[in-house]
Amino acid sequence: MNLELQLHAQLERNDIREEEKLELVKRNPTVHFEIPSITFGEGRQSRVSALEIKKENTTRKVIWKRCGVEKKLQKEEAENLCKRLVPYREVLRTHGWNVPNIFYSEVVEQESGYVVFSYEELIEAIDTERMFKEVSTAHFERLAVLQKIITTLTNKEHEHLVKKEYFGRTFSQLPYGIDLKLANLILDAQGSLHFVDFFGPKELTPEGVWKTYNTKLDSLSQEKLLVVCATREGCILRMLKLALRHLPHKDMTIVYFNHFKDIITHSPLPEYEKQYILQELENGFPLLTSVYEESKV
């Protein structure tokens, strides 16, 4: 492990006092932590921070992720996930998703198990979950998120999707899985939408099953996870429900409900997919109720 990773591993330890951690940073002046303008924190699987690296009068900001925190991953499990980060990112890029560059990733041992340290390109914007919740967010910005997702999911790389049956219905199977939720998306100032979460790479085999699946990371069964993360209809429905949930005021729900219906109706989605998604939207997302039961989306 190089010096920079050794430093970061030390800073992650819970048995070192904050004063000692500050001394570690002072003794390593080439790595500077700053309080970022964007709010970062802990997700279900990862801790995320912004780093400012200063070397030879140049400054570069990167995202530092600690993936698999508190998941008690074995070394082999962490290594399998780590080695799939770059290939998975390339699969997404090939299919039209904007994804940040990964500079470096490494498996690191901690007291609670093995985690993956990942250093990635910083996209200067907040995630779309926070954006949706902000009262000051422009109306068109929220609508742009859904419209851009559908634009990507209907591009030429998605023209001939394989049909698979789940829950007694035929769905359009994506050639990859993707955890499409608002917290994993960033809309930048130029209007480009970026998918920024590669951990737990959701790659599929040619037969349409998961290349890597780990119950430590995913609470859903493999089939249910396929429905909401690897079918076009399931991905869109999940996004619609999350978008309606994260509006800042309840009285905005009906306005966005109708706008979302218009976006689906006028989208290039196949007609049978449109009708199914609209029916699910009107009926309160029965598919998602079946998938998640009592769990949260």
Predicted regions and their residues:
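Short, flexible/disordered intra-domain loops and linkers
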Residues: 67-79, 130-137, 171, 207-211
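Conserved structural core of kinase catalytic domains
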Residues: 96-151
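Short, solvent-exposed loop/turn segments that connect beta-strands within catalytic domains
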Residues: 54-60, 109-114, 189-192
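An alpha-helical support segment within catalytic cores of ATP-dependent transferases
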Residues: 143-173
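Helical subdomain adjoining the active site within ATP-dependent kinase catalytic cores
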Residues: 222-297
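Catalytic activation segment of kinase domains across protein kinase-like and atypical kinase folds
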Residues: 166-234
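Juxta-kinase regulatory segment immediately upstream of eukaryotic protein kinase catalytic domains
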Residues: 1-37
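ATP-binding glycine-rich loop module of kinase domains
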Residues: 34-90
